[in-house]
Structures are given as C-alpha cells and as structure tokens.
C-alpha cells in the first residue's frame, strides 16, 4: 500500500486531537483562574455540520478517515469528497485496506450522482453499478459520506468537557447505549469557533466488563477540509457507463420501473412503465435500490423472476429487466 504518508498525517493530527480532549469520560476539572472557554452544544454542532448546510456555504467538502484496531494498528484509510453542481449532488470515495483489516489488503473506489453510483475494487475484475429510485436522491448520496454522528435511539450522551486549544473548540462526548452490554464510545470534536464547522473528529469504541474493567476496541479518526477542487481519484463511472453512440463492445441494458401515477391506473410512460436505457461494461454487477424491497423480472408479464442477489446478466449484447416494488407486486 502507498497510504503511509496519509496515515502518518492523520495519526499526527489525531494525537493532537486526543490530547486536547484529554479524559475518556466524566471528570473535567475547572480552573477558575482561567478564562471561560467558548461553549458549543451538540445541537449547534449538528446543525452547523448538516451536509446540506455545508454545501450552501462551500463548493466542496473533503473528509479523510483512518480506522485502527484495539492495538492501534491501522486497518484502513479513506478519502471522501462531495459537492453540488447545478443543484445535483456528486460524490466519490476511495478506501485503502491494509493487511490488518478483516478483508485483507485491498482498494475500493466509488463515484455517485443522484441516480446511480459505481464501485470497483482492486481485488475484483468486475465493477458494480447501483441504480436507485429513492425519493430523496441527494440524501441517499450524503448518507454515504462521513458526518457528525447522532446518538440514535436508546442512547444516553454525557458531555465530558469543552475547552479551547490553538484557536479551536474541543468538545468530548460519551455515548452509551442502554442495551449495549457494556459497549460505548467517546467522540472528540475539534471545531472552528467562528463557524462551528468540524475540523477533526475521533470516535473511540470501548467495552466495560462486569467487573468495571474498560478496554479500547478501536478508533476512527476524521479530518475535514473545505473548498478544495473537486477531483475524483478514479473515474469509476466512466469505466462502467458508455455513451449511446459508443462503438465499444458493451451490454445494452434496458430497465422498466413503475411510473409515478401508474398505481392510480393512469396511463403513464409505456403502459404504466417508465423506461431507461444505458450501456454498461460486460460483467458489470447491476443492483437496483429503492425505499422498498424490489422484485426483478425478465419479461413484461412478470413470469420470469430474476434472482435479486444473482442480479442481471450483463455478459451478453443486451439485457432487459422489469423492476417491481414488493408492495406493488401482486
């Protein structure tokens, strides 16, 4: 792997972040002789770092990430970037897994727009293309990007401390799940005091056994930067999709989906179907996603089911698929 420079840089900034956050939980001493540090609440932090809000203020958002195990051995690093161009959210990511990860040494690249995203790994000759029909296409992409974590249900959060260091606010928060059998995590935020935007964040997972002994389970480190040029490290979409006038030896994929209004009996699209045609590289794994589970068929009469996990066969010259949300599949 050639990610050691990035790993070292992230580790150095993480050491500073963790040292600033200090304690793991609970006990923070207050020195009355010092100025009161600027305060920020979790609610303010989440609102300021809402991804849509960030895109209203910045051309791009870039996040680097590193995960280490309980022995502080790096398991992977990653980089993400997202932007909004003419009201369309675009994003890409690149994971670099080390030999210490569960998957072993590998690399994964991905690109996404509001209709689909493509992904491929160094260990697999075939790429994958996910086509989605969700109502909020922007949020679907943004959910793939690192963000300020929420507590979730059945969780209890404790503010461990808030201080200032080197012109930034440092906030430490511990989250315990009420039914987690001793598992919890501490999040340390480094925040720009002028904008309340995240600069760095660490998330450390712990486990406390029945005797009160605490062990670290692993740590994820994040670093945010803003307004860098948007540039994917690999154009995966171009490796998967081809123009309609392309002379490449590819598969012509036609897919049908119930058009809006067809559930009311309206004659919309082609007999109630909307139809799309794309050209994909041979062997591309095709996945269709919706807010509901889907059934796939090879014929208009819906008599020839396609196994959802086997997917559509794109090894030939053409392929056709009819996509039916299960609640509409009678």
Which residues are covered by each model-predicted region?
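Extended beta-strand-rich segments in extracellular/periplasmic secretory proteins, especially
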Residues: 131-202
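Conserved "repeat-terminator" motif of extracellular CCP/Sushi domains
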Residues: 240, 318-330
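An acidic-aromatic
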Residues: 75, 81-144
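Surface-exposed interfaces of beta-sheet-rich extracellular modules
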Residues: 284-305
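N-terminal leader/targeting segments and the immediate start of mature chains
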Residues: 19-89, 162, 234-246
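Bacterial N-terminal signal peptides that target proteins for export
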Residues: 1-8
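Non-transmembrane domains of secretory- and envelope-associated proteins
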Residues: 39-40, 46-50, 153-155, 194-254
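Hydrophobic core
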Residues: 12-17
């Amino acid at each position: 792997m050639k990610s050691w420079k990035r790993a070292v840089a992230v580790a150095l900034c993480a050491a500073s972040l963790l040292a600033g956050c200090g304690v793991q939980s609970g006990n923070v001493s207050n020195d009355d002789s010092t100025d009161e540090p600027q305060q920020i609440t979790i609610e303010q932090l989440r609102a300021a770092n809402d991804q849509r809000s960030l895109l209203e203020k910045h051309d791009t958002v870039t996040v680097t990430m590193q995960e280490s195990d309980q022995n502080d051995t790096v398991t992977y690093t990653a980089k993400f970037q997202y932007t909004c161009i003419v009201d369309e959210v675009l994003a890409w990511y690149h994971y670099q897994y080390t030999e210490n990860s569960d998957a072993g040494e590998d690399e994964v690249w991905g690109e996404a727009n509001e209709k689909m995203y493509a992904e491929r790994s160094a260990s697999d000759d075939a790429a994958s293309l996910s086509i989605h029909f969700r109502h909020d296409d922007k949020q679907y992409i943004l959910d793939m990007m690192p963000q300020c974590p929420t507590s979730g249900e059945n969780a209890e959060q404790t503010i461990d401390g808030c201080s200032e260091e080197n012109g930034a606010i440092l906030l430490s928060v511990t989250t315990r799940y009420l039914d987690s059998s001793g598992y919890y995590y501490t999040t340390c935020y480094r925040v720009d005091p002028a904008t309340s935007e995240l600069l760095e964040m660490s998330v450390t997972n712990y486990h406390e056994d029945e005797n009160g002994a605490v062990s670290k389970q692993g740590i994820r480190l994040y670093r945010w930067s803003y307004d860098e040029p948007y540039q994917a490290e690999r154009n995966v979409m171009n490796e998967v999709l081809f123009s309609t006038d392309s002379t490449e030896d590819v598969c012509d994929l036609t897919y049908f989906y119930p058009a809006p209004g067809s559930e009311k009996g309206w004659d919309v699209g082609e007999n109630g179907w909307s139809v799309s045609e794309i050209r994909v590289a041979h062997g591309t794994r095709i996945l269709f996603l919706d807010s509901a589970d889907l059934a796939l068929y090879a014929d208009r009469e819906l008599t020839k089911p396609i196994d959802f996990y086997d997917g559509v066969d794109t090894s030939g010259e053409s392929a056709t698929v009819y996509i039916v949300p299960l609640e509409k599949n009678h």
